[in-house]
Structures are given as C-alpha cells and as structure tokens.
Amino acid sequence: MDDTPDIKLPYLFRVSVEKVRAKLTGRERALFDLLCVAGHLGRSLPNSNSNRRTVSGARDPRKQLLRLAARMDGTTEEWDAASARMLNVVIRELTRHDKEEPYRALRVLLGNASIALAPDCVVPRDASLLVAWKTVVALFARLYRSTIKPLGRLSWIDEQQLAMLKRETARGRTRGRHASGMRPGRAGRTLAVDPRLMRAVGKALGLSASPGYQARYIFYTRDGDYFWPHPDDPEYAVNVLVCLDHRRPARGPGSALLAYRPDGSVERYELAPGSALAVEARGLVHAREPMRRGERMTVLSINVKAV
C-alpha cells in the first residue's frame, strides 16, 4: 500500500486490499487506507485478555491513527461524500467475491478497524476518525441485518437451572478472563439448542431460528475487563447472550452491551441474571462496557442460524 504508513499485511489480506484500493481514488482511497491501518492495529491487540489496561496510554492504537488522519484535509461534507462512494465500491466487491478467501479476509480486516478506532468503547471525537468509524459501522449494517432485541427473563430458567449453569462456570470464573471461550457442560449445551429459545429468538427477530451448535462462556472477572467494538463472524446470523451472573458495582450503573449505529449513536442494553439478548451481531458493531470497580459478570454466548 503506497502512500500509507509502513504496515505489513499478511499476503491473504494484501491480495484483496490491493485490488479494492486500485478501484478507489482521492479521499475514498485515503479513507480506505485509514480503515486498513486501523484493521491491522485492531487485529494485533490481545483478543484473549481484553482489559482497558491493554489499550491505555502508549498502547492506545488511536495515537498512530491520529497521525495518519492529520494528513487528511477536507470538509466534513467532502469526507461524508467520500465515505458513501467508498462504501458502494467495497460492498460491491465484498458481495461479488463473497466466497473467495481473500475477500473474507478483507471483511475481517475492516471489522477489526472498529477495535482500533474505539478501543475504549467511546465513539471517536476527532473528525477524521469519526468519519472512519461511521463508515465501518455502516459497512456491516449494509452487509447484514443488525437488529438487537431483549428477550427478557427466560421463563424456563428457574433458580435451580440458573444455579446449575453457574456451577458449570465455577472453574472458568476462577481462571478469569483467559477462560473466556470455554465450552459449556451439559446444562449450557442443553440451553443452546432449546426449542423454546429458538422460538423466542425467531419471534423477536422475525426469522426462523435453528441451533448453531456453538456456545461459549464469557468471563469478566477483573475491574476493566470488557470487549471492544466488533462485528461477529458472519457464519452465524444471530448471537444470543444469556446473563448467568452479574455482581453489580457498589456505585453507578452496571456494565451494558453497547450497540453502535451508523449515525454515531450508541444504544445500551443491561442484562440481569437469567435474561437474554438476541443480536444480529454480524451486521452490528457492538461491545461490552468495561467492568466497574467490584463488578463481575458471566455470560453464555450462543450462536444461532437463520433458516
């Protein structure tokens, strides 16, 4: 990538980046370059141990992005127009080459841009980074559906069932954030394929839902544990998040799931134990707010397919 900071993308990324970049000029190309650099920085962060401390101070990827953005002159209107033109080209190429691995890699790279642009879950204030942010949020909202619906308390999860699920997570809660991704035991696996859950998801989102046979426990066990903004893997249409345990902070509101919209707005969704959210997460850039002092949380993440 000429005329951009010296970053070395893996070959699989370079193939599609260079082909798409060749179709862009002027501000559209500059914006695409900024997103690719942001994606490279985002994918380099420690995904398995995300805590606010890992991206603070000198490790904040926005420092490098701001140096690049300082070279980007033009009015807000000009950059908004460039964003719209760039989006049309990128969406056309990603859709046309949907089954090709280099373009799947490009989609991952651009999704990772949201991490570097808002590593603290706060929408950028710098004008250039804000345009880039809105662009990447709009990209995934146009590629896929991006609805999010609270399912409320799941009526079939009584206190006994909730206690069984919490017992399954005991080892993971002891290990902490590193244990995130742990496969559930029998109770969690049963919930992940429960027909009642599929019906609730389908009714909430207006689709026919079937089990994805993929579920993971997520643990937030330290102050500052969180998950930065990202869209999910496109393999699954829906991600259901079931709260199993939430020790709230002594003061202030608890951590919420954040849903970002292309206009720069942010929606907050809090979960109580036993309640769930249905998220069309491959089209929705979303994040988990950092745990506040004394706050702890355990979530079961369930992948669901749309049929």
Label every model-predicted segment.
Residues D6-R62, D73-A84, I91-L207:
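Non-heme Fe(II)/2-oxoglutarate
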Residues R153-W156, P211-G212, A278-V279, S301:
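A structural signal for short, well-ordered beta-strand segments and their strand-loop junctions
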Residues Y220-L284, E295-V299, A306:
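Catalytic core of non-heme Fe(II) oxygenases with the double-stranded beta-helix
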Residues A287-R293:
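Short proline/glycine-enriched turn/loop segments at secondary-structure junctions
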Residues G206-R216:
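A short coil-to-beta-strand element that immediately follows conserved catalytic motifs
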